[in-house]
Curated annotation (Swiss-Prot):
CDD domains documented for this protein: MPP_PAPs
Protein name: Purple acid phosphatase 5
Summary of subunit composition and partner proteins: Homodimer.
UniProt similarity note: Belongs to the metallophosphoesterase superfamily. Purple acid phosphatase family.
Gene: PAP5
EC numbers, comma separated: 3.1.3.2
Binding positions for Zn(2+) per the UniProt entry: D153, N190, H250, H287
Glycosylation sites: N58, N133, N238, N303, N360
Active site per the UniProt annotation: H260 (proton donor)
Biological process per Gene Ontology, one example term: defense response to fungus
Length: 396
């Protein structure tokens, strides 16, 4: 879509591209991010208060501010502020900007607990096309979603001449109607690397790391900081407090599509034993522009005689879901391997999004919603049982 499709808001130095994400591990903090064209007094401040209050309890936080240059582009001023000690299940208003350019939004930190219901939207490889707009519209039309798990590949700026950085701005405006009101949890994809030696841009992830506060460095061997970080993160998980263990990656480990076939294999070989050992419930991936859901399988037992390995059903293993079907500019990946392998439970070359409804510590309901004209159609669904509390076989 053209830049005119997602214009900046009216008003002098108006804040734009507003998005929020979780700011701490206990659910009482939120990172508020926004962009202004100028770095004037007050443009880096977020003011927030409880919606039901009389306004006398307003609090303000000053953001950290940065900008970056990329080839012939200079970004606006990128602001990130952490608001803390929020009350659970309480609606807050927050306000950005000054004077007549003030903009107001709201957010609600959820109640926490092992049996508290919570619904995630799941999107990957979104981009900013007509199909992308349909995906986001369909997700927002369902009132259930409380946060979005995003499996990488955001703006697709690198698919345009000289990695057109204005596409990052239009993308931020595009997702703002959702991302300003509920947390989007981002994973980085290959389109976030933005490495372009031919135009002198050799710092990987420059736009992404300036715009989004999440881990972004990729690892290619078993001795990197990323490897140690993941081991430490698994140790921190307390399944009595957070029963469901969900992992976001970008390149899928189980993929029966001809596109990007086995590109995640080296990562799978390294990390899959940890996922099985720690009883990961679900792994969401993007990268392949189609939809696929696996059986619970693992591929960690190698045949000593021939050196081959074969995925086998494993009730301690995650379900692997490829959700790179958001609608990006590169189109759908419509060539699957034939016959369909036994580890693949459902696959379809269509755009769409998913909902993961956590019901309690033992059960969750998962649905994939195919884009169809002006509505979303449930094309795949399954009741999931928690691997830690109820490692039993599931049924559709």
């Amino acid at each position: 879509m053209s830049l005119e499709t997602f214009p900046p808001p009216a008003g002098y130095n108006a804040p734009e591209q507003v998005h929020i994400t979780q700011g701490d591990h206990n659910g009482r903090g939120m990172i508020i991010s926004w962009v202004t064209s100028l770095n004037e007094d007050g443009s880096n401040v977020v003011t927030y208060w409880i919606a039901s209050s009389d306004g006398s309890d307003n609090k303000s936080v000053i953001a950290t501010t940065s900008s970056y240059r990329y080839f012939d582009y200079t970004s606006g001023y990128l602001h990130h502020a952490i608001i803390k000690e929020l009350e659970y299940k309480t609606k807050y208003f927050y306000e950005l900007g000054t004077g007549r350019s003030t903009r107001q939004f709201n957010l609600t930190p959820p109640k926490v607990g092992p049996d508290v219901p919570y619904t995630f939207g799941v999107i990957g490889d979104l981009g900013q096309t007509y199909a992308s707009n349909q995906t986001l519209y369909n997700y927002m039309s369902n009132p259930k979603g409380q946060a979005v798990l995003f499996a990488g590949d955001l703006s697709y700026a690198d698919d345009h001449p000289n990695h057109d950085q204005s596409k990052w701005d239009s993308y931020g405006r595009f997702v703002e109607p959702s991302a300003a009101y509920q947390p989007w949890i981002w994973a980085a994809g290959n389109h976030e690397i933005d490495y372009a030696q031919s135009i002198g841009e050799t710092q990987p992830f420059k736009p992404y790391k300036n715009r989004y506060h999440v881990p972004y460095r990729a690892s290619q061997n078993k001795y990197t900081p990323q490897n140690s970080w993941l081991q430490d993160e698994f140790k921190k998980v307390n399944r009595s407090e957070t029963p469901w263990l969900i992992v976001l990656v970008h390149a899928p480990w189980y993929n029966s599509n001809n596109y990007h076939y086995m590109e995640g294999e080296s990562m799978r070989v390294t990390f899959e034993p940890w996922f099985v050992e720690n009883k990961v419930d679900i792994v969401f991936a993007g990268h392949v522009h189609a939809y696929e859901r696996s059986e619970r399988v693992s591929n960690i037992q190698y045949n000593i005689t021939d050196g081959m390995s074969t995925p086998v059903k494993d009730q301690n293993a995650p379900v692997y879901i490829t959700i790179g079907d958001g609608g990006n500019i590169e189109g759908i990946a419509n060539i699957f391997t034939d016959p369909q392998p036994s580890y693949s439970a459902f696959r379809e070359a269509s755009f769409g999004h998913a909902l993961l409804e956590i019901k309690n510590r033992t059960h969750a309901h998962y649905t994939w919603h195919r884009n169809k004209e002006d509505e979303a159609v449930i094309a795949d669904s399954i009741w999931l049982k928690n691997r830690y509390y109820l490692p039993e076989e599931e049924t559709i």
